[in-house]
């Protein structure tokens, strides 16, 4: 499901809400999540899951085109861990 499909589904489910208000709400929620991660914070949505940052050590990678070794710097990457309720609902599907 894309963001556009999510917005369309929400508008269909809640006809009293406008497309614009749903679109702005979804964008703001995503912006808050990204902003918190940018600040190094962990986000937890009970029953759904948590977003955090994982540290990746510097390493030597390989350019797949040339086979040349490339030094990759250390970095933080976003990580999502599904919550118990989400895992259970997916398992039943």
From Swiss-Prot:
Gene Ontology cellular-component terms listed: chromosome; cytosol
TM helices/strands, residue ranges: none
Example GO molecular function: DNA binding
A Pfam family matched in the record: Bac_DNA_binding
Leader peptide range in chain numbering: none
rRNA processing found in the keyword field: no
Gene Ontology biological-process entries: DNA recombination; regulation of DNA-templated transcription; regulation of translation
Keywords of this entry: DNA recombination, DNA-binding, Transcription, Transcription regulation, Translation regulation
HAMAP family attached to this UniProt entry: IHF_beta
Role, per record: This protein is one of the two subunits of integration host factor, a specific DNA-binding protein that functions in genetic recombination as well as in transcriptional and translational control.
Entry similarity comment: Belongs to the bacterial histone-like protein family.
Xref: PANTHER family: DNA-BINDING PROTEIN HU, INTEGRATION HOST FACTOR SUBUNIT BETA
Subunit structure: Heterodimer of an alpha and a beta chain.
UniProt protein name: Integration host factor subunit beta
Organism in which the protein naturally occurs: Glaesserella parasuis serovar 5 (strain SH0165) (Haemophilus parasuis)
């Amino acid at each position: 499901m894309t963001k556009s499909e999510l917005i369309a589904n929400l508008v269909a489910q809640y006809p009293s809400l406008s497309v614009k208000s749903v679109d702005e709400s979804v964008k703001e929620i995503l912006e808050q999540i990204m902003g918190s991660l940018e600040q190094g914070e962990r986000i937890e949505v009970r029953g759904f899951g948590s977003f955090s940052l994982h540290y990746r050590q510097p390493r030597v990678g390989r350019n797949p085109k040339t086979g040349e070794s490339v030094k990759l710097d250390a970095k933080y990457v976003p990580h999502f861990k599904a919550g118990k309720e989400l895992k259970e609902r997916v398992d039943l599907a």
